[in-house]
Amino acid sequence: MYCLRFALPLQAKRQDMDKQQNRNQAHLPYRIIALDLDGTLTNHDKVITPKTREVLLKAQQEGAIVVLASGRPTYGIVPLANELKLDTHGGFILAYNGGKIVDWGTQQECFAQHLPPSAIPVIYEYAKRKGHALLGYAGNEIVTEMPDDPYVKEESRINKMNIRRVDNLLMHLEPNPTKLLMTGEPTTMIVAEEELAEQLGDKMDVFRSAPFFLELVPKGIDKAQSLLRLLAKVNLTPADMIAFGDGYNDLSMLRLAGMGVAMANAAPEVRADADYVTLSNEEDGVAAALEKFLNI
């Protein structure tokens, strides 16, 4: 579903936001701010520090559009979107590493790409056979047959989403899911990545986002491709964007952006590829770079 299909009141709301942003942002060297969350926007406690929050609110007041771009599910991003008042200022949520875009000003889905239906039972049977936990998302809940798995609990903690135990995961997933997550000990996830990539790699992407997390997502989705869709919607170009990240899944958007900023705590390859390296996520690195490059 695309944003052009909004009901008229929502179209009017978005148009009003766009006009206000256009009036305010003329002096900004970068008019869209794309932010990874974990290890970038948030500190080790998974919270936004007061300094970083203050600078991002000020940037939005001056017309900047904030995009929260994460591998998290939509409802795992919502608390941070609300904290930064993206609903008031017309920001966007980019969830599942780009698999879904939500206009948080109107709370309407702009874009979604789904897992191929034929792959889902294959993944499910593989997890059952190997004894790995497999989870999906239903509204604001994590659904799984293994709620006591420590890595399932970690996904719950990161996203601040409750876990619901189900007897058959396939019966409780959202229609047309965008992502499944398999969890297990790091050595077993290496094997699972290799085996599932060989079996399903022509249909979908399989990769580890952490040693114990195996992501199963639509093929060809990344943050840069979804940001290009979003930039076209708001009539901006990559040159208008400053992007922040720390992980390998952030590289595509750092390369796309007019200014790609890596955190000091980023992986060495990410720092080497960035246009600029700021302070760490424990030192208000996002705020420091925005003050430098946006003159706010």
Model-found features: residue ranges?
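Short active-site oxyanion
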Residues: 63-67, 89-91, 179, 239-241, ...
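Hydrophobic packing residues within well-ordered alpha-helices of enzyme cores
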Residues: 52, 77-81, 192, 196, ...
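Residue-level signal for inorganic ion chemistry
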Residues: 39, 59, 70, 97, ...
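Conserved acidic, metal-coordinating active-site core of Asp-based
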Residues: 126-244, 248
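Mg2+-dependent phosphoryl-transfer enzymes with acidic/Ser/Thr/Gly-rich catalytic loops
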Residues: 23-32, 49, 215-296
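Non-catalytic pre-domain segments flanking phosphatase-related domains
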Residues: 1-37, 54-57, 61
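Short, structured coil segments at secondary-structure junctions
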Residues: 84, 89, 97, 200-202, ...
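Active-site phosphate-binding/coordination module
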Residues: 50-151
